[in-house]
Amino acid sequence: MSRAVSHRGAVLYRAVLCASLLCCSMGYSFSAVSQEPADARIAWWREAKFGVMIRWGLHALPGCVWNGIRFQGPSDWIQFRARVPSSEYAALTAQFTAPLFNPDEWAQSIKDAGTQYLILPAKSYDGFCLFDSALTDFKITATPFGRDFLREMSDTCRREHIRFGVYYSILDWHHPDYLPRGPDSPRPWDERPTDTADYDRYIDYVKRQMEELLTRYGPIDILWFDGAWEHTPAENHADELIRHVRTLQPGILVNNRLGVPGDFHALDSMPEHPLPDRPWEMSISLHDTYGYKRYDVEWKESSEIITQLATCSAKGGHLLLNIGPDDSGAFPPPVRERLKQIGEWTR
């Protein structure tokens, strides 16, 4: 990328950012959150226009390929799309070594891009935990890798002055109490018995994992829920869960993906008028899927990302860029390259 192009991108970004801040001050993009405590805790987030989400875990091992067959869609949906039984998928833990994982290198790449916050995975749809939970053996510390990913990354983020949050999926294809499964469910191939499963007991498991995350890993800026769509907010005890989270860390931000209003809207596409009446962010990926795809060659150009960033800023929102480290624990070269290029534009 030429220096002239980089300069034009930086000018565009700064001009649009100034315009977006002016629009916000005039009440153009969204109404202010009325509660004073909510205003206080989200103040820093309103100023941050650009975040990164890491999509990584056990699903990076197959990398969208199962038994030699390539599957489309996000890499963290490989178990669903390939219809892999829970026990067969769990056997992947014996192969999880991530020899190239280096939290300092990850943090440097994030800083190179000029991002203001980072979302780290704690538990994805497959139920695999990237922290040392005492409530399950299906976790990263029980693999040959043996290290507490979330501990190392959270410590590194604080040392490098990077605000961070954790991604947590309600959907869990591994936990025996998570429902539905079996016939007449989205996963008819999951033949584990359901007569002893108890969804309320599963939600208690979620609450206890919230306690682990919010009492053992220091201050966390954002709790990024996902995967709540198979149950109603009442079935997920959403209000109770958020109250529990607020009791543990009153200043934490929570998105709206439990089906109840949170501090901000987490969107998957660019909003049109009327714009959301609360703070919002839009998620995109550096390629055509979320997470690591072993056969991927279709990468977005940095110019496309900066255009999306500028558009989000102009509308009063944030861009959340999703990236997928590979099974070795390293950022693929196209990811590192584009993060640096984006950083040249934003600076």
Regions found by a protein language model. Give the residues of each.
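N-terminal secretory signal peptides that target proteins for export/translocation
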Residues: 1-11
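Mature catalytic domains of secreted/periplasmic carbohydrate-active enzymes
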Residues: 30-347
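Bacterial N-terminal signal peptides
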Residues: 14-28
